[in-house]
Amino acid sequence: MMRQILTVLAVLLLPVVTQAAELVPHRAVYDMGFLKRAHDTPYAQVDGRMVYHYDLTCTGATYNHRMLLILVSKQGQEIRSETFLSFYETTDGHTMRFDIRELLNDVVVVELQGTVKRPSVGEPGTVTYDKREGPEGEQLAEVPAGALFPMQHTDALISAAIDGSVIHNARTFDGDEVSLVDSFIQPSREPGREAGVVPETMADMKSWISRISFFKPDAEEPVPFYETQMRFWENGLSGDFTMESEDFGVLAELKEVELFDRPDCD
């Protein structure tokens, strides 16, 4: 699920916006459950928890994520799925370090560690893997010009929303593969279930609902392999969201939020 949770995509350069997003360091905890509308799913029950920690330094940003899912098949078999993600991206978008692990029933099935470096966002980047075990497909040696790293995409999406855009397209790289991502954005006019969870300081903060579809660049049919719908605020916090693939769907509900101060880099 790592690539499906993170990937994002379809312009060659970061979008030009009139107002930049002010992302805030934070920690968020989500309870995960079965999304009832998922069709043809092999699972009868899904439970889990996700912890997300976003932090800023004076030279870049870090993203740490742990997700645990307990899946029960229709035959009663229980599967324990864990995903660990750690990213560091420089502010200029020239460098990204990534450390990714996926486990099934406590056995490591995917492990990726490496670095991407490029002269600028508008130029191709070189991928160097320290470890690459488990993922399908050929190892990528070069990231295409204009591809956004995960946190770059988040920043670009929020900036587009602040600017009033209703559609945002991008090409993204998540440490393993390039995806094309189409996002449809609309202002959130209702407070939502999360109103009782987010800090009072966010009571008057703008938020949006976005439907985000992920496509493989070389797919024969323009059908998304993964979709998510989420509420997000202008400070970077995500509220409740869904994750849906062809045969699998999860609902995540925001349960805990901690906001932290931005670093003083003057």
Descriptions of predicted regions:
Residues 28-30, 48-50, 63-65, 83-85, ...:
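Hydrophobic residues positioned within well-ordered beta-strands of beta-sheet architectures
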Residues 1-5:
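Positively charged n-region of N-terminal signal peptides that target proteins for export
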Residues 99-266:
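Mature, soluble, non-transmembrane domains
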Residues 65-120:
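Hydrophobic/aromatic-rich structural module bridging two neighboring secondary-structure elements via a short loop
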Residues 21-25, 53-62, 88-94, 201-203, ...:
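A short, structured loop/turn motif at beta-sheet edges
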